[in-house]
Amino acid sequence: HRETIEMFRRVRDKNNIPAAVMLDTKGPEIRIKNFKDGKTELKAGQTFVLTTAEVEGTNESVSITYKALPEQLKIGNKILIDDGRISMEVTDLTATDIVCKVLTGGEISNHKGVNVPYVHLDFPYLSEQDEKDLVFGVKMDVDFVAASFVRSKEDVIEIRKFLDYYGGHHIKIIAKIENMEGVQNFDEILKHADGIM
């Protein structure tokens, strides 16, 4: 990435083009893991299990990346996968499994995002990878950080403090609103971010 940024800046400066460099964080996200065949088909009405156990995904179950998810959900919660293309309702919970009824079926493939609307999930905003990426961004003197999956003003404040600590006071934060919690907290996020995406 360093070479790409340096090349971009050389071309920008040579041609006197006003263009900025933005670093996009991964953000706090939950994803499904892998299916045996890379994908499967889910039908409305069927039972499907999201599990913290390491399993090879089938049309009956798949592993998820966030181990504490079962303990933070309740029966009746809705779960959206792949930007809402697949929807489910939680019907039962164990220490490792989230048993769901598929509401909206379709094809589902490896590494799709998992979203739980109206449920505050208690996990840290900045991952270890995000921290490494932000330090790199400060070293490369990026102009903006696109902060993925911002849920509240606290997420923006956490990034601001982190950037400031490493000398990135000038870096502007663009909050990416990508879930229901972010929508619900839109006004407070807007007051603390330099922009919204």
Task: Please provide the spans of the model-predicted regions.
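Non-catalytic helical/linker scaffolds that mediate oligomerization, partner binding
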Residues: 1-197
